[in-house]
Amino acid sequence: MGPGLTLSGMTEQSSLFPAPAPKGSALVAAKIKALREQLNRWAHEYYVQDTPSVPDAEYDRAFQELQALEGAYPDLVTPDSPTQRVLGAVLDGLTPVRHRVPMLSIRTETDTEASGAQAFDARVRRELKLPPDAPPVEYVAEPKFDGLAMSLRYEGGRLVQAATRGDGEVGEDVTHNVRTIRQIPLSLPAGVPRVLEVRGEVYMRRADFDALNERQREKGDKTFVNPRNAAAGAVRQLDSGITAQRPLSFFAYGLGEVTPAAEGGPDFGTHFGMLQQLKEWGFPVAAQVQIAQGASELIAFHQRVGAERDALPYDIDGVVYKVNSLALQRQLGFVTREPRWAVAHKYPAQEMVTRVEGIDVQVGRTGKLTPVARLAPVFVGGVTVTNATLHNLFELRRKKVRVGDQVIVRRAGDVIPEVVGVVPAGAGLAVLAGSDALVDAASSADGTAPAQPLAGPRQPYVPNFRMPRQCPICGSAVVREPGEVNHRCSGGLFCPAQRKQAVLHFAQRRAMDIEGLGEKLVDQLVEGHVIRTLPDLYRLGLSSLAQLDRMAEKSAQNVLDALDKSKRTTLARFLFGLGIRHVGEATAKDLARHFGRLDAIMDAGVEQLLQVNDVGPVVAEAIHTFFAQPHNREVVEQLRACGVTWDESEPAAAATLPLAGMTVVLTGTLPTLGRDAAKDLLESAGAKVAGSVSKKTHYVVAGADAGSKLAKAQELGIPVLDEDGLRALLRGAPPNAGGG
């Protein structure tokens, strides 16, 4: 059902849970029927209601029991059994299906503003000949899913056919694939019409799409452009085994042919009532569906769903408004094969097509180099986009982006625009006439024919992009560590692009602890070119600070006092404050203990650095590279010249430290020691302070309000110390375990 059971394995016969084999075919049939009903109920709770009532293991046990029973009694297997969702045969082609009730498209309102809803409401009122003072028309407002329209035909309560929209008159039979979609019931409860065609949308959730693409990348296979194309491709597979591995979902939103089993069949009266009935029959219906009175509530719905759009677990490209009364729908009728009683009110497109005019490199505040596509301006996601990220060199090469290519650009909400992929010649993709919106070349999302196929042949002699060897900002060497995908500037403190982050890191409490030097002040200092390097902090004067915005003389003096106080520090804090990649607090303390002197660290080779506790090849290389840059050494010397100082010592032998090799966890509030002070004492004694309790933990130090870490320690039998026990441990005396 969940992660514990893959669809690809559901058709294999299993002997793990042999059937209890009740005697008598009637008893066997009853057992099989009960198992099917139970499994269908559990699957509905899990996939449709999202409220599972049993663990996956229980579902798996019942499923395998049903498999075993059906294997022993194959004459009792029915098409609607949960075991029959994936069929083994691979088809030669898809069979055309003529829709008994045409799957007509809904007119699209291209005005994405509030006036789009007002225009639709005005047309409806005009067609109904309503006077100005008539009550508002009642509508149903729904999300417009960005997926593949589907018709599900049930006869006698069993799914017998699933067909794509096609041209509205003739689609394709994809029953073998749709059966694998767990949200679509294979059978319906008693009392449904004899013939029931349910219309809806097959789609792929964003999280499922991301996971699918990650699996494709891991296998070295082609990735998908967007969830809609992934869903459409999965539905049209000839091998249902492949479709079963693609995580598809379904929403119902309407009906096609309905033939009541007898007089007195369901008479909905309203579109909303029909949706409620579909939910009762076991079909998923979007939670956002609501009744709206008149244009004002349509506008409010459009705005609310638009604001929530990026938080939804699936893609939508607009909302749909439908007159709620079915009688009024019949009165309004159709025009040029589109219903007058419904409209799709779009949002600004989130994916568009444009051309790459160049590829630049940006340097981020942590030194990461990011290739950025310079684009022909395109309106996407509500703004004009001229640049889009390509993430890193490996992603750029995987997508095979070159200057001059036509590319798909995506922007959702506040997310940085990105190049999704190149539109190759003959890819079967197109843009709608009069826009840059990407659609399938065969048919667009709303059934209209696109006018501009993509793309032309790639321009000859366009070289592949190469990452620069020197930082485009400061000229420092560009490096990429083994196993890393990102290239980085090694300039560190010297690089202007990294300056703000470097200053904030240097000033933080666990580094140089410069009180009052926050983000807003640093922004002014760096952007106003008041400081260019870290030593410039210690050259600040009262006049240069007092002239800044919101900086009175007293506040300026407080900052100067804090700077002066910070000059007296420790070697570990100073090392941490330098912002060397991969060197955190603990590593800085290990370096300080091991070498004792800064000059020894600066002059150490990689092999010497590898002798430090918990320093591996990546960290050692990062430290060596940092101090190999002359400008980084210059910054260090200038800081010393400004009066930054600390006590140096002889190199410590780690084995002589009293707590060398021990792992200690802190939890709760100690009576007199703060957490940072306790951590410093432990690390100075050679202990490693961990954030979680495991079997490798030697002691847990617990204070007031200790939580789950204390419970975990007691469960594992790990000694628990109070503050007195900690102090005894630090003195080398036997601690009194059991405190706290």
Curated annotation (Swiss-Prot):
<feature type="binding site">
    <location>
        <position position="142"/>
    </location>
    <ligand>
        <name>NAD(+)</name>
    </ligand>
</feature>
<feature type="binding site">
    <location>
        <position position="489"/>
    </location>
    <ligand>
        <name>Zn(2+)</name>
    </ligand>
</feature>
<dbReference type="InterPro" id="IPR001679">
    <property type="entry name" value="DNA_ligase"/>
</dbReference>
<keyword id="KW-0464">Manganese</keyword>
<dbReference type="InterPro" id="IPR001357">
    <property type="entry name" value="BRCT_dom"/>
</dbReference>
<feature type="binding site">
    <location>
        <position position="346"/>
    </location>
    <ligand>
        <name>NAD(+)</name>
    </ligand>
</feature>
<keyword id="KW-0460">Magnesium</keyword>
<feature type="region of interest" description="Disordered">
    <location>
        <begin position="1"/>
        <end position="20"/>
    </location>
</feature>
<feature type="binding site">
    <location>
        <position position="495"/>
    </location>
    <ligand>
        <name>Zn(2+)</name>
    </ligand>
</feature>
<dbReference type="InterPro" id="IPR033136">
    <property type="entry name" value="DNA_ligase_CS"/>
</dbReference>
<dbReference type="InterPro" id="IPR010994">
    <property type="entry name" value="RuvA_2-like"/>
</dbReference>
<dbReference type="InterPro" id="IPR004150">
    <property type="entry name" value="NAD_DNA_ligase_OB"/>
</dbReference>
<feature type="binding site">
    <location>
        <position position="474"/>
    </location>
    <ligand>
        <name>Zn(2+)</name>
    </ligand>
</feature>
<dbReference type="Pfam" id="PF00533">
    <property type="entry name" value="BRCT"/>
</dbReference>
<dbReference type="GO" id="GO:0006260">
    <property type="term" value="P:DNA replication"/>
</dbReference>
<feature type="binding site">
    <location>
        <position position="322"/>
    </location>
    <ligand>
        <name>NAD(+)</name>
    </ligand>
</feature>
<comment type="function">
    <text>DNA ligase that catalyzes the formation of phosphodiester linkages between 5'-phosphoryl and 3'-hydroxyl groups in double-stranded DNA using NAD as a coenzyme and as the energy source for the reaction. It is essential for DNA replication and repair of damaged DNA.</text>
</comment>
<dbReference type="GO" id="GO:0006281">
    <property type="term" value="P:DNA repair"/>
</dbReference>
<dbReference type="InterPro" id="IPR004149">
    <property type="entry name" value="Znf_DNAligase_C4"/>
</dbReference>
<dbReference type="Pfam" id="PF03119">
    <property type="entry name" value="DNA_ligase_ZBD"/>
</dbReference>
<feature type="binding site">
    <location>
        <position position="471"/>
    </location>
    <ligand>
        <name>Zn(2+)</name>
    </ligand>
</feature>
<feature type="binding site">
    <location>
        <position position="201"/>
    </location>
    <ligand>
        <name>NAD(+)</name>
    </ligand>
</feature>
<feature type="binding site">
    <location>
        <begin position="56"/>
        <end position="60"/>
    </location>
    <ligand>
        <name>NAD(+)</name>
    </ligand>
</feature>
<keyword id="KW-0479">Metal-binding</keyword>
<dbReference type="InterPro" id="IPR013839">
    <property type="entry name" value="DNAligase_adenylation"/>
</dbReference>
<dbReference type="GO" id="GO:0005829">
    <property type="term" value="C:cytosol"/>
</dbReference>
<dbReference type="GO" id="GO:0003911">
    <property type="term" value="F:DNA ligase (NAD+) activity"/>
</dbReference>
<dbReference type="InterPro" id="IPR018239">
    <property type="entry name" value="DNA_ligase_AS"/>
</dbReference>
<keyword id="KW-0520">NAD</keyword>
<comment type="similarity">
    <text>Belongs to the NAD-dependent DNA ligase family. LigA subfamily.</text>
</comment>
<keyword id="KW-0862">Zinc</keyword>
<dbReference type="Pfam" id="PF03120">
    <property type="entry name" value="DNA_ligase_OB"/>
</dbReference>
<dbReference type="InterPro" id="IPR012340">
    <property type="entry name" value="NA-bd_OB-fold"/>
</dbReference>
<dbReference type="InterPro" id="IPR041663">
    <property type="entry name" value="DisA/LigA_HHH"/>
</dbReference>
<dbReference type="GO" id="GO:0003677">
    <property type="term" value="F:DNA binding"/>
</dbReference>
<dbReference type="GO" id="GO:0046872">
    <property type="term" value="F:metal ion binding"/>
</dbReference>
<keyword id="KW-0235">DNA replication</keyword>
<keyword id="KW-0227">DNA damage</keyword>
<keyword id="KW-0436">Ligase</keyword>
<feature type="binding site">
    <location>
        <begin position="105"/>
        <end position="106"/>
    </location>
    <ligand>
        <name>NAD(+)</name>
    </ligand>
</feature>
<feature type="domain" description="BRCT">
    <location>
        <begin position="654"/>
        <end position="740"/>
    </location>
</feature>
<feature type="active site" description="N6-AMP-lysine intermediate">
    <location>
        <position position="144"/>
    </location>
</feature>
